[in-house]
Each structure stands twice: as C-alpha cells, then as structure tokens.
Amino acid sequence: MSAPGGGRSGPAEWGGFEDNMQGGGSAVIDMENMDDTSGSSFEDMGEMHQRMKEEEEEEAEGEAGAGGEEDGEFLGMKGLQGQLGRQVADQMWQVGKRQASKAFSLYANIDILRPYFDVEPVQVRTRLLESMVPVKMINFPQKIAGELYGPLMLVFTLVAILLHGMKTSDTIIREGTLMGTAIGTCFGYWLGVSSFIYFLAYLCNAQITMVQMLSLLGYGLFGHCITLLVTYNIHFHSLFYIFWLVVGGLSTLRMVAVLVSRTVGHTQRLILCGTLAALHMLFLLYLHFAYHKVVEGILDTLEGPNMPPFQRVARDIPVVSNAVLNTTAKANAMTL
C-alpha cells in the first residue's frame, strides 16, 4: 500500500520540482537576462589600458619632439657656425683673388709699356743724330719715334752730367741733396714741359700724342747734354754761348720743324713752336747759370764766409840809446 502511495508521492515530488524549476527558481542560467556589469568592467579596463598606452605614446612623442627641437637647435647652431666659416673662407678667397688680380694687372701694365722700350741700339744712335738735323718738310707730318728708351736714357745722362759738373767744380755737399735736386730738375722739365706742350698742341689742333711728345722732347735734350758736357770741362762763357746757339739751336729747330709739319694755321704754329723754343733754350741757360748759383748759395751756408788769410804787419821799434846797449852788453859779459 505504501508502495503505490510512495509511487504517487514520488512523481508528485518530481513534478513539484519541475514546477519549481519552471517557476522563478530555475537552475538554468539565462545569459540574456544576466547583468552585463562584468563585461563592461573588462571593457573599461581595456579602455583604460588603451588610454594609458596612448598617453605614454603621447608623452614619448612629446619627449621625442622636445629632443628633436633640441637637436634642431644644436644643428642650427652648427649650421650657423658652418655658414660663418664659409663666409670667412669666401672673404679670404675674395681678398686673395683681388691681390692676385692686382699683381696680374700690374704685370699686364708693365707688359703694355714693354713695346715703348723695345728698341735696338742702332736705332737709338740714328735717332740721336737725326735730333740734331732739322728737316724742312711742312706739307706732310714728319715721323716721330714712339719709344721712350732713348729719351729716358738722355734724361739720366743729363742728371749724370749735372752731377759731374758739381764734382769738377770742387763742390762739397751731401750726395742725397745733390742727387735729388738734379733728378727733380731733369725729370720735372721733361714731364712737365711735355705735358704743357701736349695741352697746347691739343688746343692748336696739332696731330701729336703724349708718347710722341715725350719722345720728341726727350731726344731734344741731346743738344743740352753735349753743350753742358763740353762747357763744364772748358770754362769759357763765350764757348758756352756758341754751343748754346749752335747745338741747342739745332735740337730746338728739329722739334719746331716737326711741330710745324703737324699743326695747321700760322697762329697756332707760332704759339706752339714759339713756346717750345723759348722753354727749351731758357732751360739750357738755367742749367748753366742758375743751377750753379743755387749750389754756391748752399756752399756759403754750409761753410760760412771765406776768411782772409793771416798776414804779418810791420811794427815800429823804438830807438834805444847806445849807453843802455853798452851797459846791457857789459852786464851780460860779467855774468858769463
């Protein structure tokens, strides 16, 4: 009896259990109805981790940027120093280049002057002789040698002749002063008068260049050299005047003839040739007279005025009586 009852109670109990399970006390976990807090916490942790990672990356990028800026500043300083170094090197290069160009230009200028001194000694001798022979040719311009070797040597020769005149006249003076005066006188006349006559020739429309004028006046000093060399060794004023008129006159006429052939117009010829002839002849007179007066004045200043030689003057001796002389003689004899 008990068994069926027990059998009845068993299914009923199991049925109640089933009902309870189907009711609110079901043992099956409904994942859909569960709270999602655990999953959200995991997601929050992931987001926090991601944010921390991003912050670390940003900090790393910031540090890298700061380091890059520092490196950029350092590289900028190095670049500035390198730029300054390049500028200094460029300036040094430019200075050296300018000095080299100046040296090259100086050599080039010397090379430009070389044709004016490229002449044979035979040609110089021929031109020296021609400078003493006037040629009467007015219709055509006479040829002028465009070289400066002969005129320059004549100027130095004139300087040497002036110094020789000082030595032969027993002139005692400091060599520097004497040499400077002679060189200044000769070169001053050659360059100064050549420039002045060239200016007059330009005003008078004469066909002549500066180099030709220097050559013409330089070879014209050959007569001055001959005249002064002879008259310094033979001291006669009459001989000087003869050489002044003949030798100096021939060299002056040669230059006048050349300028006449290269100038158009009687008035222009008279002004130009008259000025040149007057200056050339007066310069020879100056070298013979005034130059020595200057030196004599210097000598008087250095040595002082000449003192007259010592001369003996006769004096009157008073007359002594014979008694005094006899007494003196006796006294001398007794002492002996």
Curated annotation (Swiss-Prot):
Annotated stretches, region: Disordered: 1-73
Compartments where located: Cell membrane; Golgi apparatus, cis-Golgi network membrane; Cytoplasm
Superkingdom to which the source organism belongs: Eukaryota
Membrane side Cytoplasmic: residue ranges: 1-143, 204-209, 261-269
Bilayer-crossing regions: 144-164, 183-203, 210-230, 240-260, 270-290
Key words of the record: Cell membrane, Cytoplasm, Differentiation, Glycoprotein, Golgi apparatus, Membrane, Transmembrane, Transmembrane helix
Topological region Lumenal: 165-182, 231-239, 291-336
Alphabetical GO biological process terms: cell differentiation
Membrane topology: Multi-pass membrane protein
GO cellular component, one term: Golgi apparatus
Ranges of biased composition (kind: Acidic residues): 55-73
Its job: Involved in the maintenance of the Golgi structure. May play a role in hematopoiesis.
Listed name of the protein: Protein YIPF3
Organism of derivation: Gallus gallus (Chicken)
Gene: YIPF3
